[in-house]
Amino acid sequence: GWPAYPGRNGIRSSVCQKKLGCGWRKLASLPVCKAFCLARKRFWQKCGKNGSSGKGSKICKSVIAHTFEKAGKGLIKLTDMAVATIIKYAGKK
């Protein structure tokens, strides 16, 4: 099924960023976090509450919607790990 619509306020990039704790302590993940939240906002704007038909229908799949809703936290965690690793190796040279 189609995931619950986060609401007009819930799809806002700033709300999404706050929920994910973007840039809080970890500035490295901020650009990734912002990009994710913006993409998520655009997705919901295009697809609406129940996956609009029409121009956006190709991307308006429940699988994508669920992925967007679940990806946030994992994405930020991964970015932080990757950045930490890069910094670690960069420091060795």
UniProtKB/Swiss-Prot annotation:
Disulphide linkage map: C16-C37, C22-C33, C47-C60
GO cellular component: extracellular region
Localization annotation: Secreted
Keywords: Cytolysis, Disulfide bond, Hemolysis, Secreted, Toxin
Segment forming the signal sequence: none
Tissue: Localized within the skin and proboscis and are most readily isolated from body mucus secretions.
GO molecular function: toxin activity
Biological process (GO), any one: killing of cells of another organism
Function noted in UniProt: Cytolysin that shows hemolytic activity (on bovine erythrocytes, HC(50)=5.75 mg/ml). This hemolytic activity is completely inhibited by small unilamelar vesicles composed of PC/PG, PC/PI and PC/PS in 1:1 molar ratios (with at least 100 mg/ml concentration). The recombinant protein does not show hemolytic activity, suggesting that it is not properly folded or that it requires a free N-terminal end for its activity.
Family per similarity comment: Belongs to the worm cytolysin family.
Protein name: Parbolysin P1
Organism per entry: Parborlasia corrugatus
